[in-house]
Amino acid sequence: MAADDYVVADMSLAAWGRKEIEIAETEMPGLMACREEFGEAKPLKGARITGSLHMTIQTAVLIETLKSLGAEVRWASCNIFSTQDHAAAAIAETGTPVFAVKGETLEEYWTYTDRIFQWPDGQPSNMILDDGGDATMYILLGARAEAGEDVLSNPDGEEEEILFQQIKKRMAETPGFFTRQRAAIRGVTEETTTGVNRLYQLQKKGLLPFPAINVNDSVTKSKFDNKYGCKESLVDGIRRATDVMMAGKVAIVCGYGDVGKGSAQSLAGAGARVKVTEADPICALQAAMDGFEVVTLDEAIATADIIITATGNKDVVSLDHMRKMKDMVILGNIGHFDNEIQVAALRNFKWVNIKPQVDLIEFPDGKRIILLSEGRLLNLGNATGHPSFVMSASFTNQVLAQIELWTRGSQYENKVYVLPKHLDEKVARLHLAKLGANLTKLSPEQAAYIGVTPEGPFKPDHYRY
């Protein structure tokens, strides 16, 4: 790695990061099993992976797993606040180009996204590992602009304006870059709900130029990372940010998908009185039967002490909503992007920074709101994200998906796929021993009776866990 082919906050943090990586490895049995199973064969040899995913200690274990399987890797964080600086330093020290600093500006964020596609030999990336879809969209939007489409004229807000400027800069410096890069990609594996939705929209419009694997909807990702991970990391983030006592407080969770379910349980476990808002009648019924009061934000917002968005949608909490909130309400988001809360509408008010990623915003009438991570992912901005064990399941899916597309990509059409059931079950199986769990074995007669083999898969694809 060239001396300038990385950007981290402080290389002196590398030793600390390495110690935490070694601890995390003991909590990530799926990734360690991948190293043992595939390390000698090097199935990712020749893969040049551009990774855009929160640069945490757990991600460091993922990066080193990909490298141990033969891949070359360049990495940036997919959120301006989610990097753990000691993790980034530890990875940079090993020679992996990483561009990630906790508290990046938006200009830096999109510069770093560009740099993970800039290999020293000038050749393009051939795989993308994405979280939220920004790396994928950067290339696809740039290629459309190079083809003459008018896609860079009307930015929707500050971040798009900065993104468009970065694309124009790269087009001027390296004509044809995006088109060549798009043609070289064999496939993308996408980590999260928001990024998956973007891929399905591209597929629907016929604009997806390579196959994609939807890692998010692997059962061992969405039903574990999204639910159990949020169940632990949401309250961790709120506590580190505010030191508030949640017992007895009224909390509203906007959205009751897998992330919302984990978030509501997290707050309830801390003793909060939880209310849920939901647009989907099925999710709303689930929330009601799980014991939560299902309300509209308009009717309940004035009662809330804590408000958390988890919808994956935009403008969920508007300025009008915020005008109705209590004084000193805690407002945060655990969805991927920062547009669930209309943070831009608050910029003309008085902001007082309490500590990193905690701001006190004063309205003209004197009312104050405590905003966490500027409306971005608070569990990563104000804490350290999900625990290692649950991320092992998610990241094992990522490794298997990268192997699948790299080794068998020609067998896939330009569509969005999920990993087959037997691999989903394999990921779960790899994590049972760590928890002391023992599987019951079906007899051949029992397996035949329910129409499966004794080794599985045990459920049809349409089964809802």
UniProtKB/Swiss-Prot annotation:
Listed GO CC annotations: cytosol
Subcellular location field: Cytoplasm
Enzyme class: hydrolase
Pfam families: AdoHcyase, AdoHcyase_NAD
Catalysed reaction equations from the record: S-adenosyl-L-homocysteine + H2O = L-homocysteine + adenosine
Keywords per UniProt: Cytoplasm, Hydrolase, NAD, One-carbon metabolism
Protein name per Swiss-Prot or TrEMBL: Adenosylhomocysteinase
Co-factor binding comment: Binds 1 NAD(+) per subunit.
GO function terms (MF aspect): adenosylhomocysteinase activity
Pathway the protein takes part in: Amino-acid biosynthesis; L-homocysteine biosynthesis; L-homocysteine from S-adenosyl-L-homocysteine: step 1/1
Main subcellular location: cytoplasm
